[in-house]
Design a protein with these regions (language model features):
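Second-shell residues forming the walls of enzyme active-site clefts
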Residues: 1-121, 127-131, 139
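Short amphipathic alpha-helical coiled-coil/interface segments
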Residues: 137-144
Length: 146
């Protein structure tokens, strides 16, 4: 379903239904060793555990990928500059939320500098623990073979 006010995609399926259908190809890709997965700007309460948080900024979605699906590679956000997402939160808020949630990389097609500064400010203030960045950098370096 699409929210007519924001344009955000809402998935209302039960988790067991998603695991039996939509998520099958992701599980196969993970088992085959795919190095990265993009987390969409889609609201899926059965995965995130939250009514209004998109998967791209959700700690619940990161936890699901890491623990339930066993994925240890890079989790990359969908475009945080996306107009429908930015009707729900600002790009900078989304960037901070995504890093706090445990995303490895942020996809920002426009306005990168502002989002960078928002994340930097959140790290400097302690809102984002340095361990979150260390984890992301570690995953990136591992993926690069460094």
């Amino acid at each position: 379903t699409t929210d007519s006010a924001t344009g955000m995609l809402w998935m209302t399926d039960k988790l067991e239904d998603l695991e039996a259908s939509d998520f099958v190809q992701y599980q196969k890709a993970i088992e085959a060793g795919v190095p990265a997965v993009m987390m969409g700007n889609v609201i899926c309460q059965s995965v995130t555990g939250e009514e209004t948080t998109p998967c791209s900024t959700s700690a619940g979605a990161v936890n699901y990928m890491r623990t339930t699906m066993g994925f240890n590679g890079l989790l990359i956000t969908d475009d945080l500059s996306d107009a429908s997402l930015n009707k729900v939160c600002t790009q900078d808020e989304a960037a901070v939320a995504a890093v706090k949630a445990g995303m490895s990389m942020l996809y920002v097609s426009t306005g990168f500098e502002s989002s960078y500064n928002a994340v930097l400010s959140a790290v400097n203030s302690g809102e984002i623990p340095a361990e979150k960045l260390d984890d992301a950098v570690g995953r990136i370096l591992t993926t690069k073979g460094i």
